[in-house]
């Protein structure tokens, strides 16, 4: 029980700004087991967003609430995944060789491609969530972050790391397939309960496809994955899920 709590708190500490203030075991096996809790952390974030939406929907118009929810997400996650998307776009669209791309991705400064990617990411999230709320799919506020984290887990099934050292290496190739498939089954079952089978399976297939295409792009550009590409995967997974859900 103590080890389970350790791994759960480790995921909260690693992926959010929620203060844990505990000396936690941070071995590779802790992250391997803790992967089970990544969608749980996403559920906590999405659940908090949904509660904010419910609390404000009778006082503010939906478009204003969605802006506040996006701001809340950026604050509670520290913009971790959005930063990964920006760094990935800066590197990949620089059209340089592998070593130079990785150097660009490690640079703390944001470039033009990263800026454009963030603007598009935020605009799409805003418009898609706003449209889905008007359509009666406010549960997407909760489900999108979870599906995004699920896509990270699937990407991490690869053992191809682009760097010898990096924060992403503690996850890449360090995933348990049974854990991933178990938590995915639970998430899809819950999504089916709220959205129906068709509105669950079709967007999820789209997310898996985008995840695989990103994986192929990473192999082509830097011969593997980094922590930044995992963050980019989350953002692309969320956008893909919301976009297809709105379309069907």
UniProtKB/Swiss-Prot annotation:
Its cofactor is Mg(2+). Pathway: Cofactor biosynthesis; adenosylcobalamin biosynthesis; adenosylcobalamin from cob(II)yrinate a,c-diamide: step 7/7. Pfam families: CobS. It is a multi-pass membrane protein. It is found in: Cell membrane. Keywords: Cell membrane, Cobalamin biosynthesis, Magnesium, Membrane, Transferase, Transmembrane, Transmembrane helix. It catalyses: alpha-ribazole + adenosylcob(III)inamide-GDP = adenosylcob(III)alamin + GMP + H(+); alpha-ribazole 5'-phosphate + adenosylcob(III)inamide-GDP = adenosylcob(III)alamin 5'-phosphate + GMP + H(+). The chain crosses the membrane at residues 36-56, 59-79, 114-134, 137-157, 170-190, 199-219. One of its GO terms (molecular function) is cobalamin 5'-phosphate synthase activity. GO terms for biological process: cobalamin biosynthetic process. GO terms for cellular component: plasma membrane. Joins adenosylcobinamide-GDP and alpha-ribazole to generate adenosylcobalamin (Ado-cobalamin). Also synthesizes adenosylcobalamin 5'-phosphate from adenosylcobinamide-GDP and alpha-ribazole 5'-phosphate. Belongs to the CobS family. This is Adenosylcobinamide-GDP ribazoletransferase. It comes from Clostridium botulinum (strain Okra / Type B1). The gene is cobS.
């Amino acid at each position: 029980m103590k080890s389970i709590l350790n791994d759960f708190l480790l995921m909260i500490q690693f992926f959010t700004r929620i203060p844990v203030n505990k000396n936690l075991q941070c071995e590779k096996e802790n992250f391997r087991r803790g992967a089970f809790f990544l969608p749980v952390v996403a559920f906590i974030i999405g659940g908090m967003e949904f509660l904010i939406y419910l609390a404000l929907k009778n006082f503010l118009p939906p478009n204003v609430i969605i802006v506040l929810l996006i701001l809340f997400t950026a604050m509670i996650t520290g913009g971790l995944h959005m930063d990964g998307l920006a760094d990935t776009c800066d590197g990949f669209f620089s059209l340089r060789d592998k070593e130079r791309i990785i150097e660009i991705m490690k640079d703390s400064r944001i470039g033009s491609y990263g800026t454009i990617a963030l603007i598009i990411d935020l605009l799409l999230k805003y418009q898609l969530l706003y449209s889905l709320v008007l359509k009666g799919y406010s549960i997407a506020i909760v489900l999108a972050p979870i599906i995004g984290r699920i896509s990270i887990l699937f990407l991490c099934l690869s053992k191809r790391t682009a760097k010898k050292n990096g924060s992403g290496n503690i996850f890449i190739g360090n995933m348990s397939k049974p854990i991933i498939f178990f938590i995915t089954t639970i998430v899809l079952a819950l999504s089916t309960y709220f959205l129906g089978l068709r509105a669950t399976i079709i967007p999820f297939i789209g997310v898996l496809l985008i995840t695989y295409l990103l994986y192929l792009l990473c192999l082509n550009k830097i011969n593997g994955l980094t922590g930044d590409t995992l963050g980019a995967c989350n953002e692309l997974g969320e956008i893909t899920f919301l976009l297809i859900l709105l379309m069907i």
